A protein has these predicted regions:
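Sec/Tat signal peptide C-region and signal peptidase I cleavage site
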Residues: 15-19
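Sec-dependent N-terminal signal peptides
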Residues: 3-13
Length: 315
């Protein structure tokens, strides 16, 4: 178990490890506001989304029997602001892996361009990230390691930025964004300037298309892709959702070389609730992952003479 904890520590606090730093979600088609500031305010209302993920259920320290499986929780909210010619958004996330905890806050703006029956959002956000580790629960080989000595109980605070562009039409969308673009570094106070954490720039490419087939009355099929990379590793999700009368949905997702996911959900008026279960296909995990998503949209009245742009229901 000490080896596993060492992997967690190095993943979060070493600039030499290649694992991606941004949290992972199966409900990526509902999570544009967290990874792409260009999507802020593109839906017709104030949209609040929450996602909770428990990864590798039942993963415990074999000595203490304490749960060490990663847990991630986030809440995002975005809304159109007419006098700003765009939208604003905020996101709060907490990612916990064994003794390591990350707290992230994002705040940003998106400028909207009307392109016929399409719309393009170009946005940016600033983010503040607090990374902390419970050193009392570690059993390091070398307690004088400068990385560990430089860590305070309050953790380290890192600022960075993200940019993104989100293009949508009534039945499809395509988007590109980059997070942690400044690649901020942090050094330990007692380690002679040795860098023990560095943000790595992440890139996102997403797209989806609503398909209506005459043979399936009331159904809307939405294939989509979600690609994330830090130029060292690549995550690619291929999704297919089927929605019936905008009330219930189900779907499948394949995360290449990692997991197959089953998704179900219901919608009642402006409330949507979804659940997914990841079945691992890699050798890293023997147990699956649970994820719950909830979203509520507060409608905003617009001038009837103004053209509306409502894309896919996943904004």
């Amino acid at each position: 178990m000490r080896v596993i904890l060492l992997v967690f520590v190095l993943s979060a606090f070493s600039s030499g490890v290649k694992a991606q730093q941004d949290p992972q979600f199966t409900h990526n088609m509902f999570n544009h506001a967290f990874v792409n500031p260009g999507s802020y305010g593109l839906s017709e209302g104030i949209t609040v989304t929450g996602i909770f993920r428990e990864q590798w259920v039942g993963f415990k320290d074999y000595k203490t029997n304490e749960k060490v499986s990663p847990e991630t929780f986030l809440v995002t909210a975005d809304a159109p602001v007419r006098f700003l010619r765009g939208g604003i958004g905020i996101g709060i996330a907490q990612d916990k892996e064994a003794q390591i905890k990350n707290m992230l806050v994002k705040l940003g703006y998106s400028y909207h361009l009307n392109l016929g029956n399409a719309k393009l959002g170009i946005g940016l956000n600033a983010n503040l990230n607090n990374k902390s580790i419970d050193k009392d629960k570690l059993n390091p080989v070398d307690e004088s390691d400068p990385v560990l000595m430089g860590l305070s109980a309050e953790g380290i605070m890192i600022t960075d930025m993200a940019v993104g562009a989100f293009f949508q039409k009534p039945r499809y969308y395509i988007a590109f964004s980059s997070t942690q673009i400044l690649e901020t570094k942090k050094t330990a106070a007692d380690s002679d300037g040795v860098t023990f954490f560095k943000n790595r720039r992440h890139y996102y490419l997403t797209g989806g298309h609503d398909i209506v087939l005459p043979a399936f009355q009331g159904y809307v099929f939405t294939p989509s892709v979600f690609i994330k990379s830090d130029m060292n590793t690549l995550q690619a999700d291929i999704n297919l959702m089927a929605r019936y009368n905008n009330k219930v949905w189900g779907g499948l997702s394949y995360r290449i070389n990692d997991a197959v996911s089953l998704m179900v959900g219901v919608a009642y008026k402006d409330l949507e609730i979804g659940y997914s279960y990841d079945i691992p296909t890699s050798q890293i995990a023997a147990t699956g992952s649970h994820e719950i998503m909830a979203r509520y949209r507060f409608k905003i009245e617009r001038d009837k003479t103004r053209t509306g742009y409502r894309n896919t229901r996943y904004l």
